[in-house]
Amino acid sequence: LPIGTLTIQETQAPEGYLINSEVYVVKITSSNDGSDFVYTYNEPEIPEQSLDLNIVKKEKGKDYVIEGAVFEHTKPDGTTETVTTDEKGACKFKGLGYGQHTIREVSVPDEYIVNDGVVTFTVAEDNTITIDSNTATGNSMQFKVEADGTASLSVEDTLAPYTLKVLKANEKDVALEGAEF
């Protein structure tokens, strides 16, 4: 490097990160004694200001949580990731970057019907979240953004319909006609 003043300034940050606005100034001099000049630039640590989305899954109209529901997150770059609810009916998508996001339920345990609602929201560069759309019916997907910026999604599923057939049989396992239940 030539003798003089060197300025270092970040001009573009990776997607999902903030630009470090500090300007670093380094003066390069020579003592003319022939020795090498070494300067180490230590990259400053800029904490990522990421957001998380907490999801809680329950049976419609009850406080019964549902384990094993799978949710899909489509990121702003079009890639997808999935998470599965735990024994508390909870799961989390971490590190939501800037741009538009889509959340949908992709599978549930056999005794439930998949909620076909889709929630779309946008994370701005100042980490504010705006809900773009929610196609769920009957408030079955409730998206909330708290004052501290925390995002949560509460999702309800209904039980799948089923038919119960009861047969009365004798001791030889032969069906008996005319029994009423």
Report each predicted region and the residues it spans.
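Solvent-exposed loop/turn and edge beta-strand elements of beta-rich ligand-binding domains
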Residues: 1-181
